[in-house]
Structure formats: structure tokens, C-alpha cells
Amino acid sequence: MYQEIALVNSEEEPDFTVRKRTLLIKFHSDIDHHNAVQIRMKADRLIERGDLRNVVFDFEEVHFMDSSGIGMIMGRYKQVIFHGGKIAACGVSNEVDRILKISGLYRVMDKFDSAEDAIEAISQRTGGR
């Protein structure tokens, strides 16, 4: 089970949960300049406060992401890699998969079928508990 540490009120805003020193961000809408800054700020607070090592992005409900979303992901990568952590993606739609490939984000993160698979894999690689 996931330990819920923050739940945003709006149905369109992402859920943030923690397991094995990994922050799972489950998106419920597309990621663009309207929401990327808010997501970044919440993720940063949780990563710093919770001494979290990894971040998993669950894109199951995402069909579009602009450059703001790409920047938000790269920023979280830079934040966790400094402490030996990793980022991963799961639930990737064909549309988002194409964006992640074109942007080169797959060079810094792996893709998994489920959040469970992603959390287990990166926790083992980084020693998360």
C-alpha cells in the first residue's frame, strides 16, 4: 500500500503519494504551463521534506504535455540525481510516449507498465526502503 502524504483538492490535479523513499505523482489531466509550476512546487516541497530519493510519474490519464511539463520532469530529475536517486515513467499513452521520446527524456528515465513495477525497480537500484 502507498502511504498518502498529500492529496490535492481538485480532481484534475495530481495525487502525490510516497513508498520506499519514492514520490509517485499520478496525473489526472494534461500537463502544460497552466499546471506545471504548481506541480513542481508541490513535488519539490515533498521531496525535500520527506528525504525522498526517487520520483515516478504516472501518465495514465495524460494525453498531452508541453515544454513546461518536460521542464518540470527534468527539474525533478536534477533534484533527485544529486542524491543518487532516479526518475521513472509509467502508464504512458502513445501520445505521451512520443513526446518523451522526442524530448530525450527516456535517456534519463525508464518506462514501466505500472507504478508498482516502477517503484520496485528504482527502489532496488537506489536502495530505497
State the predicted function of each range.
Residues Y2-L7, G128:
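Intrinsically disordered or compositionally simple regulatory linkers and C-terminal tails
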Residues A6-M41, F59:
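STAS-typified acidic loop motif
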Residues R21, K86-I87, S123:
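Long, contiguous secondary-structure blocks with strong helical propensity
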Residues H33-M109:
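Amphipathic alpha-helical interaction surfaces in cytosolic regulatory modules
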Residues A36, A115-E116:
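Residues at or immediately preceding the N-termini of alpha-helices
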Residues D110-S114:
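Short acidic-hydrophobic, aromatic-tinged amphipathic segments that line or gate anion-handling sites
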Residues E116-R129:
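A charged, well-structured terminal subsegment
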